[in-house]
Amino acid sequence: METSNFTLFDPRCRAEAPFAIDAIKQLDIFGKVLYTVLTLMATASMLVFIEECIYIYKKVPAHKKSTIIWVTGVAPVMAIMSCLGMWVPRATMFTDMTSATYFAIVVFKFLILMIEEVGGDNAFLRRCEKQTFKISTGPCCCCCPCLPNVPITRRSLFILKLGSYQFALMKLVLTIFSIVLWTNGSFSLTNVSASGAAIWINSFIGVLTIIALWPVAIMFMHVREALRTLKIVPKYAMYQLVLILSQLQTAIINILALNGTIACSPPYSSQARGYMMSQQLLIVEMFIITLVTRVLYRRQYEPIPEPDDVEEKKTVLSSKKAIDVA
């Protein structure tokens, strides 16, 4: 009998992501323990966030409450969405879109937070009326040190806000548009050809993301010294870490899955398994970020001193030190 030279291929490796009940039935003891622990971590993240919201409503000035809640909620929301995507594999596209849309809003809210920490628009303009913005910063123009500084005016501040706000608005619009195309069968995350809608929409979102991150970086570079006592540097680091983990890490895993580097494991195809791994990693990472964020934002919210007050205090301390030496 002749034997043909071929490789057996499980047809389930080309199938869509499994239904939730099928994914649950194939779990072994380790899988059940893993899913339980990850679910508890996601739930704990949301409980910590709820407790933080209660603290913010009691202790934080009214004009800062909503902004801080939006910013501190990014990690718990991503943890919960990742948990839902882990349990319901076919809902991954929607949970990822929800997380990405929330983060787009947080990009704008973090810019507003830095301005509010200084005292709001009027206080910021009064404090920095003779200063300039350094626009030769990442992610757009970090390699262009020759760019001139821009005077700080109400108009330049509005342009910075608009640069971040457009991402929050357009991300929501494009998410709704993608869902409409998906219902018509015209949108698929696995179709990365030039004829597919996903590659064009995601590329456009990438450009909008870079444009939106630029104003936040410009504002951070300007206020980081004034807000150093308010832990603005680690807060900004957490914001950047969420960006890297939710966008870059997820994109790398998805690319590896599309290329077949991540092996198929029925009932999960390569792509579905890549999404599952991404969700599980994000739950752990967002849980840790939630705990760190709670420590950073749980403080007494008092106005920062004016520059004149700081200089006066330094002068008094210097005079007192000179008298003591004499």
UniProtKB/Swiss-Prot annotation:
Q: Which UniProt keywords apply?
A: Cell membrane, Endoplasmic reticulum, Glycoprotein, Lipid transport, Membrane, Transmembrane, Transmembrane helix, Transport
- Quote the subcellular location field of this record: Cell membrane; Endoplasmic reticulum membrane
Record: glycosylation sites = 5, 184, 191, 259
Q: How does it sit in the membrane?
A: Multi-pass membrane protein
Q: Where are the transmembrane segments?
A: 29-49, 68-88, 100-120, 162-182, 199-219, 238-258, 276-296
- Which stretches are Cytoplasmic in the membrane topology? 50-67, 121-161, 220-237, 297-326
Annotated function? Essential component of the Ost-alpha/Ost-beta complex, a heterodimer that acts as the intestinal basolateral transporter responsible for the translocation of bile acids (such as taurocholate), steroids (such as estrone sulfate), and eicosanoids (such as prostaglandin E2).
Name of protein:
Organic solute transporter subunit alpha
What organism does the UniProt record list as the source?
Answer: Danio rerio
Mind giving the lineage of the organism this protein is from? Eukaryota, Metazoa, Chordata, Craniata, Vertebrata
